[in-house]
Amino acid sequence: IFTKKKSRLITTDPCFPMYKVYSEINQNKLIFIKYNKNFTLDLKDFYKKINNKIDAIIIANPNSPVGDLIQEKDLIKIIKKSNKYGIPFFIDQAYFEFSKTDMIQLVKKFDNVIISRTFSKGMGAAGIRLAYIIANYKIIKLFENVRPLYEINQIAVRYGLFLIKNYSLAKNYCVKTIISRDKLCKIFEKNKIIVINSKTNSI
């Protein structure tokens, strides 16, 4: 929808591996934002790399496999600059249930923000391959124009509806995971083992 052959995309390194795969398939050029030695994203470099030659930006927030989370105030600065150039800004929130953050308000503030979420992580339903996007009306219409004829099977629909109606089951699972994750991080720190305070379901 937003890219073509030789389009330039910004993402982080490391990132979700499929970003690279799909970029290669579409013959796009990926521009990577690296992490510093203390495992924090170089936000100054991120801001600097945004210009009128960039066609799209995609980040995972929280990011797996690193586990870090870009704070909303820092994210807004980057989004504002990308919006100035009309650059679509994708936020992959596959792990948002484990971060206690919600970026939906950014869709209301900026018309270039697209949020994707999945039932695979916090919902524990990777096998049904069910996900969704949150964006403004104009962007949703663009996605509707390229929807495949057979996109979601009936098993995925039924199980997805079950999980929505019984969201407390998934929420309890996420809470237990967060408690265990944070407890393990403290044990590592106590034993002087360097660890990133992850905001995903892993360390």
Per-region residue spans from a language model:
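Short Gly/Ser/Thr- and Asp/Glu-enriched loop/turn motifs at secondary-structure junctions
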Residues: I196-S202
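Phosphate-binding glycine-rich loop
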Residues: I1-R8
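Short beta->alpha connector loops at strand-helix junctions that form conserved
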Residues: D13, F32-K37, Q93, R117
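Helix C-cap/helix->beta junction micro-motif
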Residues: N26, K84-Y85, F110, N191
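Active-site phosphate-binding strand-loop segment of PLP-dependent enzymes
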Residues: K37-E97
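PLP-dependent aminotransferase class I/II
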Residues: N112-F188, I194-I196
